[in-house]
């Protein structure tokens, strides 16, 4: 087997309890995970994962399942590079020995994903690592956690999966050439998160387009587009200059969180202040500035006003990528020239977007 399987074929294998390999983007973790629907897990499946894949066996679940089990997050301040939402590790409360064997780990997973599972059915810590998927799945965050829950959910299965990173014999991460060989050897299909995003995007949107109207700003007239986030209920704005074309580069600035401090702060934490971004787009007579709303409580607003926090670089919320990407795709933007410092943007290709360059703010 030497090709990427389309998502319908991946879904078909997941539905009958088979494992698949799911890969993410080269500019993200650039790894492949063994993945199967959690409700079909067996000791044999766990043994295959730990023997052949060698990574950490994790249990992606949707938020409702995590809350049902009363699982706290592993840390209140997530410093992981890609924001993976680990809860505390778990073990089945009954029927296991040390918890580490393939049979024990399978029983822990079976217990946790049972429709009748209760908090007292599991204990912490343990040898299985649950992951809380973002609501909205890969349309919000392009991770294996969300892909696992999506693939189960799209088949009408319990919204949980078992995943394990594939590692080479020498301890390095398996990349696509090794993953192709692994898939052929074990007769497994390979799917990509990018394809899953594209597949869902054809028929789904997490945003409701509320319409648009011209708006006057100190930097000229823009067309203001208003969107409501179906998951959070928050309102997002896009200020558009000109008519974006799929064939030409579009200046793009995605600004989040949108706050009064973006107007009055002399040294904002964003590389491009909002006024500078609007001025630059006005000069170019073409571009899009997106204002993503996120609730900012008193403590975080106070932190931004104090000297110690005023110049701290802003850390993007992983949910911002998916929401911003959907807005841009809906505006017919395809080729992005980003107003910002060079960085990687995960999962954009699944939305039909391409970053062709960056433009840093003048100091």
Swiss-Prot record:
Keyword Transferase applies: no
Protein name, as recorded: 3,4-dihydroxy-2-butanone 4-phosphate synthase
Region feature (GTP cyclohydrolase II-like): 205-363
Organism ancestry: Bacteria, Pseudomonadati, Pseudomonadota, Betaproteobacteria, Neisseriales
CC cofactor: Mg(2+); Mn(2+)
Any Pfam family: GTP_cyclohydro2
Annotated positions binding Mg(2+) 2: 29, 144
UniProt keyword list: Lyase, Magnesium, Manganese, Metal-binding, Riboflavin biosynthesis
Region (DHBP synthase): 1-202
Similarity annotation: In the N-terminal section; belongs to the DHBP synthase family. In the C-terminal section; belongs to the GTP cyclohydrolase II family.
Enzyme Commission (EC) number: 4.1.99.12
The keyword Manganese belongs to this UniProt entry's keyword annotation: yes
Entries under HAMAP family matching the protein: RibB
GO biological process: riboflavin biosynthetic process
Native organism: Neisseria meningitidis serogroup A / serotype 4A (strain DSM 15465 / Z2491)
InterPro entries listed in its UniProt record: DHBP_synth_RibB-like_a/b_dom, DHBP_synthase_RibB, GTP_cyclohydro_II, RibA-like_sf
Cofactor note: Binds 2 divalent metal cations per subunit. Magnesium or manganese.
Residues that, per the record, bind D-ribulose 5-phosphate: 28-29, 33, 141-145, 165
Marked site: Essential for catalytic activity: 127, 165
Positions contributing to Mg(2+) 1 binding: 29
